[in-house]
Amino acid sequence: MDNNYALPPSGRTPVWRHITKAAKSGDFILQVCQACETVQYPPRELCKDCLQDKLEWQKLSPQGELISHTNLHASTNAFFRRYLPRKIALIKMDCGPIIFAHIAYSDAKTGDRLTIMSKRDLSGEGVFIALTDLIEANVQLDQLNKLLLQD
């Protein structure tokens, strides 16, 4: 039997390490191009708009609007198969980009305002968690902690 099922996949790009570091304190950070001020997601080495390499990590507003969500009912990864179905979402951030996040509140609807929190998953990598203000954050996080969060 393969014992690798115990943890979520840990492969991320080296650029992602900044998000993992920020997740220790729960900060929401993204790269901002110092040449054209475009906020970047996903993290990258060159600006998606002007191709400059002047990207700086900044703490940004964690607020956004839910634009799409779905329940995952299948996975090719053994770890995630144990925790299906799971809700994931696309959130249009007030600071600009659309990000992918795990969503903690199962009744969230398109158009709902959400707050993004950085957390570490069981492999120690940073992930984004979308929370609603309709329910206490600790209640929402308890559901995800059982599944995939370290802290």
PLM feature segments, named:
Residues 1-28, 122-139:
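A broadly conserved sequence feature marking short terminus-proximal activation segments
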Residues 27-30, 44:
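Residues immediately within or flanking Cys/His clusters that coordinate Zn2+
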Residues 32-35, 46-52:
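Short, cysteine/histidine-rich loop/knuckle motifs that typically chelate Zn2+
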Residues 41, 54-56:
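Short functional micro-motifs and their immediate structural scaffolds
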Residues 64-67, 103:
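Conserved hydrophobic positions within beta-strands
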Residues 69-74:
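Short, conserved beta-turn/loop elements at beta-strand boundaries and strand-helix junctions
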Residues 82-98:
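Short, basic/aromatic beta-hairpin or loop at an interaction surface
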Residues 96-151:
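Well-ordered alpha/beta subsegment
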